A protein has these predicted regions:
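Nucleotide-activated sugar donor-binding and catalytic core shared by glycosyltransferases
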Residues: 1-180
Length: 180
């Protein structure tokens, strides 16, 4: 609400981990006083301009939406929930977006550290810190652009990591490369 007051016209796009939870997430935001709609319900007759929160209820559309974002808050990382451990912060980094994530990024520790060290991400731990960081990035465009570039540099440096790992493992396991 604090960020909304200082930055009217903001649009929040929420992507539940499981799209079948979209209706429940939509009800939570509506109960909190936000004008909310499911992504599948958007149309020319129901423009996003009159909406504050769009809840994604379809698989496979999140990545391209990062291109439209000003800032990305990577979920699954604010609370310690068994089996989650954060979502992939390289997805918004690919689009040069400044990134926020919580302290529970156990599935992406190395990338988390690289993004924080490079200045491409901010770690937030509660609603107050999310609002402060988001407000700063929305107010200071040059900071958001710089963070986005730094996040993209981390993405670029880590492209092909799976292929590099496979090539290294193959070389180690290939008997033709064994030395007496």
């Amino acid at each position: 609400a604090v960020v909304r007051e200082k930055h009217p016209g903001l649009l929040l796009i929420v992507a539940p981990r499981d799209p079948s939870r979209a209706a429940a997430v939509q009800r939570l935001f509506a109960a909190a006083g936000f004008a909310t709609v499911a992504m599948s319900a958007l149309s020319a007759r129901n423009p996003a301009l009159t909406v504050e929160v769009v809840v994604i209820d379809t698989l496979g559309i999140l990545k391209p939406l990062y291109a439209l974002a000003d800032v990305a808050l990577v979920g699954g990382s604010l609370l310690e929930i068994r089996g989650i451990g954060g979502h992939n912060p390289l997805e918004p980094a690919a689009f040069a977006k400044p990134i926020q994530f919580g302290p529970h990024m156990k599935n992406f520790r190395q990338i988390e550290q690289l993004l924080l060290s490079a200045g491409g991400a901010t770690q937030v731990t509660d609603a107050r810190r999310i609002a402060a960081s988001l407000g700063e990035l929305l107010t200071h465009h040059e900071l958001a652009v710089r963070m986005g570039r730094q996040a993209h540099a981390v993405f670029t440096a880590n492209q092909g990591a799976v292929e590099k790992t496979l090539a290294s493992a193959t070389a180690l396991l290939d008997p033709a490369d064994a030395h007496p």
